[in-house]
């Protein structure tokens, strides 16, 4: 489609939907009754009697109703499918042509971005969920949970661990009506409306906003973090503040931990390992706490230390060289290694 044709199509679609207040009111009234006279329309609407004839003739010119020139004139409803068929074709043609012109912008690579509109904030939630490769944590309102149920289920299907907090808990979908098992690997409800909405993919890419910001409050902002060192802050907040105080269980499979599995958050890793009795092995990538140099260690996990408060979360790995290496999370100070990713398996150190 040429630029001139594209512009004409867009203008035509715009004109097609340019209905005034009286036209909309008259059209819906005729549509609901099937056939009316001008007097009937005046009686059933707030359209002044002198304006009724001009209004219905405008609808007739657009092909939305049929005018039968009898005494009195009769205005007959037409099937919306037939009446809007031409507009549908124009619209589909326009969308196809616009799609061909569209260049998808690269994802913002800035460390921190502020976004204001509700639609943009919600779009970023979809982006974060889609980006998750192995770990996804979300704090969602009930409406956001239902909106992104299919996206969350797709993440679960591709092997992503999905922990979800729903707030306010009193409005969370009933487990008998909502398939938490399909959309999450664990879900809890949290009391009150003060809980922020959050999504963090693999401890790196994240979005943070207040509940007001996703209720179309134009004075609120969402914050996008696109670096692991910053996404970790949101992930840590989720683990230590939100998850630990979400007391209503919505879905807890209470099954044997599925391994191999990769973690971005050491707290979640250590918490899960509390339920494992047999030997497990780990591959850890991160950096040396003292020198800042990149570190990669592999070996058997011989000890874990964990407190529900989140203040302590450590694994000790016995390497093939006979070293005992203490591994902590982001900004670790007491351990030997600051872990960025931890892969855990039962039989041998997994690939990472």
UniProtKB/Swiss-Prot annotation:
Chain residues forming the annotated DNA-binding region: 36-57
Family: Belongs to the transcriptional regulator TrmB family.
PANTHER family referenced in this protein's UniProt entry, alphabetically: HTH-TYPE TRANSCRIPTIONAL REGULATOR TRMBL2
Top-level division of the source organism's lineage: Archaea
Name of the gene: trmB
Official protein name in the record: HTH-type sugar sensing transcriptional regulator TrmB
Effect of gene knockout: Deletion causes severe growth defect in various conditions, such as nutrient starvation in defined media, metal depletion and excess, and oxidative stress.
Comment text on domains: Contains an N-terminal DNA-binding domain and a C-terminal sugar-binding domain.
Function, as annotated: Coordinates the expression of genes functioning in central metabolism and its associated pathways. Acts both as a transcriptional activator and a repressor in response to carbon source availability. Binds to an inverted palindromic sequence in the promoters or ORFs of target genes.
Means of activity regulation: Does not bind DNA in the presence of high glucose or glycerol.
Gene Ontology molecular function, alphabetical: DNA binding
Keywords: Activator, DNA-binding, Repressor, Transcription, Transcription regulation
CDD domains assigned to the protein according to its UniProt record, in alphabetical order: HTH_ARSR, PLDc_like_TrmB_middle
